[in-house]
Amino acid sequence: MELKSVDAALLQKAVLAAAKGLEAKKEWINELNVFPVPDGDTGTNMTMTIMAAAREVAAIENPTMESIAKALSSGSLRGARGNSGVILSQLFRGFTKEIKESNEITVTSLANAFTRATETAYKAVMKPKEGTILTVAKGMAEKAVDLATQTDDVIDFLTQVIEEGDY
């Protein structure tokens, strides 16, 4: 099955699925986190952040890109916990700035949104460190830009972008 674009209703479902997916990997992320500080709560903080956003996104009855973008950005910021949660909220903030005025999202707009998300998150961190969530986001954004000229299938595109972040 090919998917050429994502509308607001599908984006709403995707955000909710992503929140459940992150929650399922919370403990694994907690164990994975050892740099820059092995605090063991990165997965928990990111989960609390995305769940706050997901609650706001789920409450939207007739979704538009603008309403999803607003709920995702504001919900994640208000629910941000710890450094990783704040960075995640800034990734969402940048992503939503890029998509909020769209009727649908294509691989090109996703690549632009991932790039803007990464730029926004880097700017929000006073002293960004490589080897953190920022590095993963940057690698995924770069992969997205490369792929945007190679495929127009959103599923294929996202599968490859996610694989890039899973190194």
What are these regions, as identified by a protein language model?
Residues 1-167:
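N-terminal loops that bind phosphate or other acidic moieties
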